Amino acid sequence: MTSFTQARFVKARAAGFAAALSVLMLGSAAPAQTILQATIGEPNQKTAEVSTADVRRVLADGSAILLDTRKRAEYVAGHIAGAQNVAPPASAPASEYVAAVEKLVGGDKSKALVLYCNGPNCQASKQLSEQLVAAGFTNVRRYQLGLPMWRTMSGPVEIELEGVLRVYKVDQTAVFFDGRSADEFATKSLSGTHNVPADKVKAEGLRGAPTPSNDFNTRIVLFGRDGAQARVLADALGKSAMQNVSYFPGTFEELAVAVKAP
């Protein structure tokens, strides 16, 4: 290779390296997408998707109604905190579901709606979103990653009274944590529940809490003096490895009365 040819080779190589470096720098300038911004990204869908970060924002600012599109029995067993459900009986025609949503928004079909169900392969949110669009709704989106991803990202999940009673009286597969003080627990408590005072959790974390150590998917149901106290426990457990945590947003007295009822 002559000195002239060698010089041309070195120059071309340097130019190629510079071009590659500029592409790399341009790529790195864009912020990397995190799992919170992720969507499934399916093509040719009639409604757009939103991410977990979008759902968090919607719940924080109230800019849309978060609608759980699953059956009522699934909703009461655990749903994204702040979500609503207007599902009619399973045998009802599609028009009845659409009418229920229209009632929920007070007839305003431009109202922003975000629908979700049981994750990527669940069809409920897709089906209802398409029915709503066909009925004239103009601002319908889907959180297609759904409840499984919400739990994975430690999002708070509420369980309704009906769901708590079913788990406590019939299913009996859950661990129950009572967030009231030790004195309140000693005075009155529900059989089989564990006392994990919310005020101590704030100060000391979950040290000493009887969390399952062999199965991190064990269902854990939290309650307290009221929903705010139960939420303290939920937020603390959301920072742990436990994957199946729900909290009751009502009061202890409400729960105690219902548990004692035949």
Where are these regions (language model features)?
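Bacterial N-terminal signal peptides
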Residues: 16-27
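Extracytoplasmic
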Residues: 58, 66
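Secreted/periplasmic proteins that engage bacterial cell-wall peptidoglycan
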Residues: 70
